[in-house]
Amino acid sequence: MKLSTKVTELTNIIAPAVAACDVALWGIEFAPQGNRSLLRIYIEALPEEQAQNKQVTIENCAAVNHQVSGILEVHDPISGEFILEVSSPGFDRAFFSDEQMHAYVGQTVSLRLIQAIGEGDKKRRKATGTLNSIDATSLKLTATDGEQFEIALSNIDKANLIYEDA
């Protein structure tokens, strides 16, 4: 889950504006699309508010949109027109860093891998299962078919939480 140089640049510009709105930056997606790009910002309630079961509101999203729009006008890091979207990460949230997964040990995740794992006919580049543990270099996953994997974090292209209704 390596961030592009452009996403890193945008994160550095946007993070202070998001923090000024009393919410946490979960992640950024940037997709150049011809002459119009898409910038999607995911925000989350601050940890102390999450502990009180508070969540991101539409008002939070609107405030971040307003703040970030102003910052982007000044810094102008995106050439051409762009669409700005601000949202919560949702139940099936994408992980933008390895560190974000630590809070979800014991839950179901979906991984898209750079290189296939497994043996013979069971080789796969996608894996879904229970996240058993994660450390600085790898994670352990029990796939939905019961197979156990240790996967290098550097082999993960994309990771998402899979929401399961309790």
UniProtKB/Swiss-Prot annotation:
Pfam families with a match to the protein in the record: DUF150_C, RimP_N
UniProt-annotated location(s): Cytoplasm
CDD domains associated with the record: YlxS_C (cd01734)
SUPFAM superfamilies on file: YhbC-like, C-terminal domain (SSF74942), YhbC-like, N-terminal domain (SSF75420)
GO (cellular component) term, any one: cytosol
InterPro entries to which the protein is assigned, alphabetical: Ribosome_maturation_RimP, RimP_C, RimP_C_sf, RimP_N, RimP_N_sf
Biological-process GO terms, alphabetical: ribosomal small subunit assembly; translation
Coiled-coil regions, chain positions: none
Alphabetic keyword roster: Cytoplasm, Ribosome biogenesis
Family statement drawn from the similarity comment of this UniProt entry: Belongs to the RimP family.
General function of this protein: Required for maturation of 30S ribosomal subunits.
Family annotation (NCBIfam families): PRK14631.1 (NF011224)
Protein name, per record: Ribosome maturation factor RimP
Organism, as annotated: Psychrobacter cryohalolentis (strain ATCC BAA-1226 / DSM 17306 / VKM B-2378 / K5)
Gene: rimP
